[in-house]
Every structure is written in C-alpha cells, then in structure tokens.
C-alpha cells in the first residue's frame, strides 16, 4: 500500500478515487505513568512513556486506515493526515485518514 501526504504519488497515475479511508484508536493514560509524568514535568524534559504511547497509537491508527483502504479496493492512499482529540479525562483518540485510490 502506497501512502502519501500529498495529492499525488510521484511516478504514479491515480485512475480511480474510492472514498475516505480511516482508522482510529483510543488510548487511556496509566495512573502509574501519570505520577512519573508529573515528576518529569516538574524536572523538565521529554515524557518518554507518553511519546512512546502516542507513536504506537499513530502506527495503529495508520494500520487500521490501510486495512480500511484495502477493503475499499485501494492500492494507495493520498492526502494522509492525522487528527487527535481528547475523548475524556485521560483518554485521547488518534485518527488517521486519507483518500483511498487506485494507482498505476
């Protein structure tokens, strides 16, 4: 599956647009990690547990978007973007989305 944040894929011709491909995940924080994050925040620096959690969440959302695109019959997704939103205290959603297309 080819992915691009641009409207096109260099060297490929879009032959058909198949619609919106999307994938999401919702992750909740862990109370033990929150305590460590508070301490890290006070001391300054990167909160690596949250960085890792967000990176894993982006990959999972992207994998689910690719799966959705395959179900639509696509071999590529263009205009790939990510969105995040707070669902409730301590839980966030990451959404990956783009236009599922056929390219040759």
Segments (PLM) and residue ranges:
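Short active-site-adjacent helix-start/loop capping segments
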Residues: 29-30, 86-88
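Short, solvent-exposed loop/turn elements at beta->coil junctions and helix N-caps
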Residues: 6-9, 82-87
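N-terminal presequence-like segments and the immediate start of the first folded domain
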Residues: 1-33, 71, 75, 94-104
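Short, well-ordered alpha-helical segments
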Residues: 21, 26, 34-81
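A short, glycine/Asx- and small/polar-enriched loop/turn
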Residues: 88-94
